[in-house]
């Protein structure tokens, strides 16, 4: 199937039906790079008037995820027209996922991940500042805090986090991920007082958190920071607390829910 579709594509056929089937086949074959290149070659050549069709929307929805790409920028620029062909809820959902994916790539970047793309970061911030969706303030707060982490300015990071919580910019439980990702950056901080500040904040949040799996995750973070500060006894105690909260979470769910396993 894939080889037949490839031959037709290479022979110059470009109907949306062929493209849709070819891109699906590439996706099934885990050929993401080729899939992205094929989608981009077709979609990037379309004008605003040409791109606004149901078929093209389906191609964008399934094959384009970068909010800075030309097709998604065209969706944003012609949002009302795309709402008409695809429905507001569907279009907004796609945009939110695309933007959050791009934000996560930046916020989870650490110094061992190769060179940081400053230009892309600046472009993304500029795009977000021009949009008005409920999730945008949280996304921007994440990008602003991430800059302090990259610079190793941990005091600035803590202040940035406090600012974000003061204005209550997160929704749907996103603040938990934001808090944990950033507070754990203190494991790279050599100022023991600042690391302890992070530990104390974790304790405060844990006391305010009702979800037992979330409490377990916070204790995992606490153990990492106490280890950084050389408090092995405290770290062991935090790990025991983590296990206790995890067991309670499983018990309360009747064994139906399990906590996501960390890979690091």
Regions inferred by a protein language model and the residue ranges of each:
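Oxidative protein folding and maturation machinery
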Residues: 1-264
């Amino acid at each position: 199937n894939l080889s037949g579709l490839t031959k037709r594509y290479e022979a110059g056929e470009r109907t949306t039906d062929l493209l849709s089937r070819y891109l699906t086949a590439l996706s099934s074959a885990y050929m993401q790079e080729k899939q992205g290149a094929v989608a981009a070659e077709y979609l990037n050549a379309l004008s605003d008037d040409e791109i606004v069709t149901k078929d093209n929307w389906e191609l964008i929805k399934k094959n384009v995820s970068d909010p800075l790409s030309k097709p998604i920028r065209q969706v944003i620029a012609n949002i009302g027209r795309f709402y008409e062909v695809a429905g507001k809820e569907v279009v907004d959902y796609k945009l939110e996922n695309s933007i959050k994916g791009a934000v996560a790539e930046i916020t989870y970047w650490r110094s061992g991940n190769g060179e940081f793309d400053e230009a892309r970061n600046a472009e993304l911030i500029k795009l977000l500042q021009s949009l008005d969706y409920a999730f945008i303030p949280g996304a921007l707060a994440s990008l602003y805090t991430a800059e302090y982490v990259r610079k190793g300015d941990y005091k600035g990071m803590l202040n940035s986090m406090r600012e974000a919580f003061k204005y209550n910019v997160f929704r749907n439980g996103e603040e938990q991920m934001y808090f944990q990702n950033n507070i754990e950056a203190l494991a790279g901080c050599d100022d023991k007082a600042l690391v302890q500040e992070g530990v104390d904040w974790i304790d405060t949040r844990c006391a305010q958190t009702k979800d037992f799996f979330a409490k377990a995750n916070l204790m995992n973070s606490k153990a990492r920071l106490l280890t950084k500060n050389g408090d092995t006894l405290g770290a062991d105690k935090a790990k025991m607390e983590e296990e206790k909260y995890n067991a309670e979470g499983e018990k309360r769910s009747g064994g139906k829910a399990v906590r996501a396993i960390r890979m690091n």
